Design a protein with these regions (language model features):
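Alpha/beta enzyme core
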Residues: 58, 123-157, 161, 165-251, ...
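Hydrophobic faces of well-ordered beta-strands that scaffold small-molecule active sites
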Residues: 33-37, 83-86, 113-117, 139-141, ...
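Active-site beta-loop-alpha junctions enriched in small/polar residues
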Residues: 38-40, 88-90, 118-120, 146-148, ...
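Glycine-rich, positively charged N-terminal anion/phosphate-binding segment
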Residues: 7, 16-23, 38-135
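N-terminal small/glycine-rich loop or linker at the start of catalytic domains
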Residues: 25-32, 91-112, 147-157, 182-198
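Alpha/beta catalytic cores of nucleotide-metabolism and tRNA/nucleoside-modifying enzymes
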Residues: 1-29, 33-34, 39, 45, ...
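A structural motif
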Residues: 55, 80, 137-138, 219, ...
Length: 353
């Protein structure tokens, strides 16, 4: 895959930049798509698989010539979007928990190392951000205010935290300031973003106040899952909230919720005015969704309709990546849940099974 030289350096004119792009701090997403952080799912192997599908669908002028990072316009270029790690607990990172340290060691082929943090203590969050930035472990840091899982919200974290406005402001401000201070040793300032829901429930809608406070604190973008914490993943995402948020803030807004096919992303951007989309459950067992997203967002009519044989090849590729990352035994255990997702809707028996 080849990348024109002008995409490896600061462009001399706007016409040389990709037309479908969003800026996250100093970084450029040439395709406005983000793989959502998902616990137990978005490890390095799955992120790489999704990115491989996404980059295979890029227009010729955006296809990278090699793996790894692409300096561009004072930051980094992510041709096919952003692929975020699993949620990392700030305290575990500060305490140098071995499993957590493994989670933040990203694939060396990644274009832009994006790590999501979860925590409820501003001081610990600042320390965790400092570690990631000073030790050159991340190029982008996202803060989790969207997790609806009870074991997280019961502690006042995740999607319950924005209701505690003073704590929310302290956490975001601590992260942004820590990133700025630690970035002095880096070639660019590592941006901090947030991901949140519209509120705890219909009686406790928090997203607009939280977004304005986060923007004032200096975040570089805001992702909104258009459901309440109470909804978890039930019902339909209420995209109109994304549009309201976009009109309320000046930083980029990424919409999340009910992106199942490539055309859903196009529709979300058209109906909400959002700058990009975040994809979660829609890609479980369907990493080729990222090829369809790239095709759709760059105006190509091509879509992916894999038969069972093609799906089995994807499973093999996924298994190989996992085996290299965590060893064959753990890879087999990790792959089991993915196989159930992969084979949903297919009649499987005999040799394939």
């Amino acid at each position: 895959m080849s990348l024109p030289q002008n995409l490896s350096a600061t462009p001399s004119s706007p016409s040389e930049t990709p037309s479908h792009q969003v800026k996250i701090g100093p970084h450029t997403l040439a395709t406005p798509v983000e793989l959502a952080p998902m616990a137990g799912v978005t490890n390095a192997s799955f992120r790489r698989l999704c990115r491989e599908f996404a980059e295979s669908a890029l227009p010729e002028q955006l296809r990278p010539a090699s793996s790894g990072q692409i300096p561009y316009d004072g930051g980094l270029l992510a041709p096919a979007g952003l692929f975020v790690t699993e949620m990392v607990t700030t305290r575990a990172l500060v305490e140098r928990n071995p499993k957590t340290l493994q989670m933040v060691r990203t694939d060396p082929t990644e274009r832009l190392r994006s790590i999501q943090l979860y925590g409820v203590d501003p001081n610990v969050t600042a320390q965790a951000v400092g570690i990631l930035v000073r030790e050159n472990l991340a190029d982008h840091i996202d803060l989790n205010f969207g997790c609806p899982v009870p074991k997280v919200t019961r502690k006042g974290g995740g999607s319950a935290l924005p209701w505690k406005r003073d704590l929310f402001k302290s956490l975001v401000n601590a992260a942004v300031q820590a990133a700025k201070a630690a970035s002095e040793s880096r070639d660019f300032e590592v941006p901090v973003t947030i991901k949140m829901r519209i509120g705890i429930d219909d009686d406790h809608i928090t997203y607009l106040d939280s977004a304005r406070e986060a923007e004032d604190a200096g975040v570089s973008a805001i992702a909104l899952h258009a459901r309440t914490a109470q909804q978890h993943y039930s019902g339909s995402a209420q995209w109109d909230y994304i549009g309201t948020l976009k009109r309320a803030v000046s930083v980029p807004v990424l919409g999340n919720g009910d992106i199942w096919v490539g055309d859903d992303a196009v529709n979300m951007l058209a109906t909400t005015g959002a700058d990009g989309v975040v994809v979660g459950r829609g890609c479980q067992g369907r990493p080729w969704l990222f090829a369809d997203l790239v095709h759709a967002l760059h105006g190509s009519p091509e879509r992916t309709h894999p038969d069972l044989a093609a799906v089995l090849e994807v499973i093999r590729r996924h298994a190989d990546l996992l085996s290299d990352e965590i060893g064959p035994d753990r890879a087999i255990r990790d792959l089991r849940k993915h196989i159930g997702w992969y084979l949903k809707g297919y009649s499987v028996g005999g040799e394939a099974r």
